Amino acid sequence: GLGDVYKRQGALVSFLGETGSFYRVSPVSIEGEWWVPRRYVKLLSDSTQFNHVVVVDRGDQNIATLERLEEGTWAIRSMNPATTGMHRPPYAQETPLGMFVVQQKKSRMVFLKDGSAATGGYAPYASRFTNGAYIHGVPVNVPRTAMIEYSWSLGTTPRSHMCVRNATSHAKFVYDWAPTERSLVIVIE
C-alpha cells in the first residue's frame, strides 16, 4: 500500500469534502488526495486571496517578496540574502520545501539553548510558516539584548535550526507586510 504520508503543519491544501471526522484534501505541492482528521486542518474562507508571497530559495540562500497588484500582475517588493536550516540532528534541520501559509507572528521569538531548558536568546520579527520554522531577523544570543541588523553569513550556507534568517530590517518588513493566514511562503531548492 501507499503507507502513511505526512505533510508539514501549515502546508497549503485544497479542501475537497468531508466525511465524519475527516476532511478530504489535496496538497498543493504534491499530487494526490488524502483523508485527514479534522483536527489537523484549519479551513480558510473560500474567498481567501494570497496577495503576499515570500519565496525562499534554499539553493541560493536568498529570499524575495512578491505582491499581487491585480489579477496577473505581481510586483517584486524585496530581494535579500538569507540563511536557511542546516542538517544537524537532533536540534537543527533543513528548512522544509513546499508551500505554506503564514500562521503566526512574534515580535520576539524566544529560543532555547540546544539540549537545554535555558533561554538562548531571541529572534526578532518572527513570522511562523510551519511547525518551528519562522522567517526572522538575526538572532540575539543571551546575555546580549539589543537587536543586530546584519550577519556576514547571510546568503552563504545553511546555518539556522530550520528557520529563514535574514537582515533584521527585512524581517521587520515581512512581519509588517505579510498578513497572517493571507500570505504564502514558498520554499524552493
What are these regions (language model features)?
Residues 7-39:
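SH3/SH3-like beta-barrel superfamily modules
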Residues 7-8, 16-18, 45-49, 56-58, ...:
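Extracellular/periplasmic catalytic domains that process cell-envelope and extracellular macromolecules
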Residues 18-20, 28-30, 41, 59-61, ...:
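Solvent-exposed coil/turn segments that connect beta secondary-structure elements
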Residues 2-6:
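Short, small-residue-biased leader/transition segments that mark boundaries at the very start
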Residues 95-97, 109-189:
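Exported/periplasmic cell-wall-interacting domains
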Residues 8-11, 61, 169-176:
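Solvent-exposed, polar/charged alpha-helical surfaces in well-ordered, non-transmembrane soluble domains
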Residues 36-89:
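A structural motif detector for short, solvent-exposed N-terminal "entry" segments of globular domains
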Residues 78-112:
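Flexible, glycine-rich surface segments
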